[in-house]
Amino acid sequence: MSKLFSFALVWVLAFGSSLVTAAEHPNIVWITSEDHGPEMGCYGDKLAVTPNVDALAKKGMLFNLGWSCAPVCAPARTTIITGMYPPSIGGQHMRSMVNLPAQIQFYPTFLRSQGYYCTNNSKTDYNVNQQTTGWNESSNKAHYRNREKGQPFFAIFNSTISHESKIRVRPHEKVLDPAKVRVPAYHP
């Protein structure tokens, strides 16, 4: 029995890393939609018309308990891409452009070391001075479809339609009746 166990242990140690399944390396899609709250159909907003996001939420993962560590786009992206609380690295203010300590890497760097194909389409403003080398592609044409067959991927797609800079485009038409919009209790 101990010889069988020893053989099994040696086999797992020698070949175990090649037995990775898709569940252990799931594909990851990060869709950035900035500067808004949970006003989407998948979160129960009856006025929101968000059929594509709703379909993704139904088939994928929907976070029901989340918050932003930063109230504006670039510092929030810094938090997500580094996993760091913004004040802990000096990135809490818009346009902080901090120098990250060498031991803090963007997580696509780690994912690439694990065999992932990493794409960024296409915001590169992470509120830090360094640019990551964690991408296989980073442009408005970057896409996970360019990876090797069977290779797991991490893909960021950035939507700009909800970005704060878009709310000042004039003239604009009212899409909803303001009287029907639910104002969260934390607003005055």
Segments (PLM) and residue ranges:
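Bacterial N-terminal signal peptides
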Residues: 6-18
